[in-house]
Design a protein with these regions (language model features):
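Mature extracytoplasmic/periplasmic domains
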Residues: 200-261
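A conserved helix-loop-strand patch within extracytoplasmic ligand-binding domains
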Residues: 41-101
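Ligand-binding "clamshell"
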Residues: 29-36, 58-62, 173-185, 247-250
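Early extracytoplasmic/lumenal segment of secretory-pathway proteins
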Residues: 1-27
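A bilobed periplasmic-binding-protein/Venus flytrap-type ligand-binding module shared by bacterial periplasmic
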Residues: 73-80, 114-118, 193-208, 216, ...
Length: 295
């Protein structure tokens, strides 16, 4: 997201179509980097489910067409972890010391700690951000987690870890490959994200961008993309064509009671970002079991 944003901002007119996530769409709308969409030219928009429209980052759905969505959750090896995995608390359980993998991501790892502490993943309250920091510092003492990038997709299959944070698409794909691996969205909720197709405000080929968005939003296209990538589709017609074990998987298409506890990231004000940055610096400086921690 951040690399895409910088390229669009510093090279106006170079890119016609971009695929930002929710919070980045909010930021780009505020900075007039996105063009309003003429839905008369995108008839396949009718197939996008109502649950994915008019969300906080684009409340009138003028700028974005949902493309793919997912969650952050937990993947674990059920042949080695036999207790029910229903809560984020398990990532703080000392009996899994040296087995836990966490994201090398300020926002994602602090989000899990905020959820565990009972707060919003978009908290702007200093005491709540401090509480999340303290949760991760305590986790460091209890389980000495490994921080890295996408290690969850390799460490669990290789038997190097028993339980990891992971994005839903990767988690569900690994579950398909190994029946002992289980992906779950904890009962407390998680980050629910949406990647969308957007047209830049300086696009030179708006017609081509509209045609591509309409093509991707077609039922058959959306179905092929979802099957290939493994993430859940916002296309209600495509979902109906997915195998029953996919469309009825509660950890892919979550039940309402879990979905209601999930949150989309918002673009944080600069002063709040600084609070998150400072918390992350303290977490990084305390953690020796890491692979180049990053923002």
């Amino acid at each position: 997201n951040e690399i895409m944003y910088q390229k669009v901002k510093t090279n106006p007119g170079t890119y016609d179509l971009v695929v930002p996530s929710d919070y980045m769409i909010e930021k780009m709308i505020q900075e007039d980097l996105l063009e309003t969409i003429d839905y008369n030219n995108i008839p396949n928009y009718q197939y996008i489910g109502e649950n994915y429209k008019n969300l906080s980052y684009d409340p009138t759905n003028e700028y974005s067409v949902p493309y793919m969505w997912g969650t952050i959750g937990i993947i674990y090896d059920s042949s080695r972890i036999t207790e029910p995995v229903t809560s984020w608390d398990i990532l703080w359980d000392s009996k899994y010391k040296d087995e836990v993998y966490m994201f090398n991501s300020l926002r994602d790892s602090l989000a899990i700690a905020l959820i565990k502490a009972g707060y919003s993943i978009n908290s702007d309250v200093p005491s709540e951000i401090d509480a999340a920091k303290d949760e991760l510092l305590e986790q460091r003492k209890l389980v000495d987690p490994i921080y890295g990038v996408d290690n969850g997709t390799t460490m669990i299959p290789a038997g190097e870890s028993d339980i990891n944070m992971i994005w839903s698409g990767e988690g569900l794909n690994l579950q398909d490959e190994n029946p002992n691996l289980v992906y779950v969205v904890p009962k407390e909720g998680a980050n629910f994200w949406i990647d969308s197709l957007c047209i830049t405000s300086n696009a030179k080929n708006v017609e081509g961008a509209e045609k591509f968005i309409n093509f991707v939003s077609d039922k058959e296209s959306a179905l092929r993309i979802a099957d290939e990538i493994g993430y859940t589709t916002p296309n209600k017609e495509a979902r109906l064509e997915q195998p029953e074990e996919v469309r009825n998987n509660p950890n892919a298409y979550m039940p309402k009671e879990i979905m209601d506890r999930c949150e989309i990231y918002t673009d944080l004000p600069k002063d709040v970002k600084k609070l998150y940055d400072n918390a992350w610096i303290q977490i990084k400086s305390s953690n020796q079991n890491e692979e180049g921690l990053d923002n």
